[in-house]
């Protein structure tokens, strides 16, 4: 696709814009030749040597949402090969302003925010090859905080996209084209400098969200993602971000932690191990429409899995155990007779069992909650398990799945 390579003159950019707009129309054509040609044009777009200029021009000149969607997709594909930090910085801020002030459908907005997050990660990681600079990632966190305070859906979207970028456990965890230690440094910066400021604002906004608010689904997804954060092992008090980079660069990567436990690093313990986290989730589960309570229960499972980094930094963790059990007892009742909520029963049962497992269970049994409440919780768990095993399995249309749930 040599026609997409030159982008230095206005007429070249105009020609590219026309080609891409036409390709977006023909990509769904019944004619195989037209579909193939359109696909070739869109697949060639990320290879343009002037990708940033082409993307800015197309997003500015075209009024078609489909064009914006495909152009941003091409940008996400090609961004790992762009190394000009000044150019990346300019387009990142431009994309943020455009996404915030330009009305777009949700599927286009999702690509905007992912592009902004990937750009921020790439700039932060690339800076380690010259002078480590955390500005891009910290600025992204500040933007998300500012937008969250106005209950803007962009704030939730930015925060959610940033959290999800660190949840994937595959080797190729990011499309930002970073080396492993550069990606870990980004995670360390988030843990040290972004989470302490962003997550309290996020939880406060979540608690203040009205029952009829349209932001509930994305907000619940965002909260669930951040409460599932897997803490990076770091020195207790890194004196600077540059020293933090040196530590990450020189420290061999640790094996992943067991999936059943989330060890909370000492600096984050006052935030993540606070009893109010459980209270906020319970409030949202009561107030929000379906399917938000499901996300809240999944977030509660994260909280049930929390463990202090060490016994010396347990802080308010015992009080959080008690608060979460109180919230569960208020929210969950005996299962009803429908056949479609086995997964929900399984999820709630997992929260109870993780909460009453090992050290967490010892805390509860040692007086964090009254003995009658603990006994009632055990009765509820047993009742649900027996209900699934001896009621749902025999009469359910999905007997295999129900049986697996009962055994689990």
Listing of model-derived features with the role each one plays in the protein:
Residues 16-36, 65-80, 109-113, 152-183, ...:
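HEAT-repeat alpha-solenoid elements in large eukaryotic scaffold proteins
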